[in-house]
A protein has these predicted regions:
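Extracellular/periplasmic ectodomains of large secreted or surface enzymes and adhesion receptors
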Residues: 1-25, 53-56, 67, 80
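Short loop/turn motifs at secondary-structure junctions and domain boundaries
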Residues: 11-13, 31-35
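Envelope-exposed proteins and targeting segments
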Residues: 19, 24, 38-40, 121, ...
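Solvent-exposed loop/turn tips at the surfaces of repeat/solenoid architectures
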Residues: 25-26, 47
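Short beta-turn/strand-loop junction motif enriched in small, turn-promoting residues
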Residues: 28-33, 125-128
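Histidine-rich, glycine-flanked metal-binding segment
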Residues: 34-72
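Divalent-metal coordination cores built from histidine and acidic residues
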Residues: 66-160
Length: 160
C-alpha cells in the first residue's frame, strides 16, 4: 500500500504542490470598498493572490475559464471543534486554562477536506463547554495533507 498525504485511506498518493493558477473573467467579491468586480482576472501563486485585474497573463499558469463563476476570499470559522483528537473537553477541573488545543490538532481529520471544499480556509479551534474556564484555542490555516505544525499560525495569541 503506498504512502498517502495525509497517510490515511482518503489521502493523496502524491503530495499536493502549490500551482500558479489564473482565473479569467470571474465575478470577484472583494468584501472591501471595491465591492463586486465583474469579468475580473485573479492570479494565484504559491497559494496566495498575486494579482487582481483585467487582462492578466502568466505563461506558467494553469488557466481556468471562470466566466459565470464567483470568487470570494476564504471563509474564517471563528468557532470550530473539528480536527481535535480527544481534547475538546477537560471535564475533571473547573479551569483547564493550562491546556491548549494546539497540542491535539489532528491533521488527518476528513473534516479539514470538507471545510476546504465548502470555502473555509481558516478556523479557530476551541475547547468544549465541560467547564467554566476552558483551555486555550488554536488558530489554523487549513492545508489538506499538511502536518498540524504546518497548519498552526505561528506566534499566535493563545485565547481562552
Amino acid at each position: 500500500m503506498p504512502t498517502t498525504y495525509p497517510n490515511v485511506a482518503y489521502g493523496n498518493v502524491k503530495k499536493l504542490e502549490t500551482q500558479t493558477i489564473l482565473f479569467k473573467n470571474a465575478t470577484v467579491w472583494t468584501n472591501e470598498k471595491e465591492g463586486i468586480l465583474e469579468q475580473t482576472d485573479v492570479l494565484v501563486k504559491n497559494g496566495k493572490i498575486a494579482a487582481i485585474g483585467k487582462n492578466i497573463s502568466d505563461a506558467s499558469a494553469t488557466v481556468v475559464d471562470a466566466k459565470g463563476k464567483h470568487l470570494t476570499s476564504g471563509i474564517i470559522d471563528e468557532h470550530s471543534h473539528i480536527a481535535i483528537s480527544n481534547g475538546v473537553n477537560e471535564g475533571g477541573h473547573n479551569s483547564s486554562a493550562e491546556v491548549t488545543i494546539q497540542d491535539v490538532v489532528n491533521s488527518e481529520d476528513i473534516n479539514i477536506y470538507r471545510d476546504l471544499a465548502g470555502g473555509v480556509t481558516t478556523s479557530q479551534l476551541l475547547h468544549g463547554s465541560a467547564n467554566p474556564i476552558g483551555g486555550r484555542s488554536a488558530i489554523v490555516k487549513w492545508k489538506w495533507g499538511a502536518s498540524a505544525d504546518e497548519m498552526l499560525y505561528k506566534n499566535q495569541i493563545l485565547n481562552i
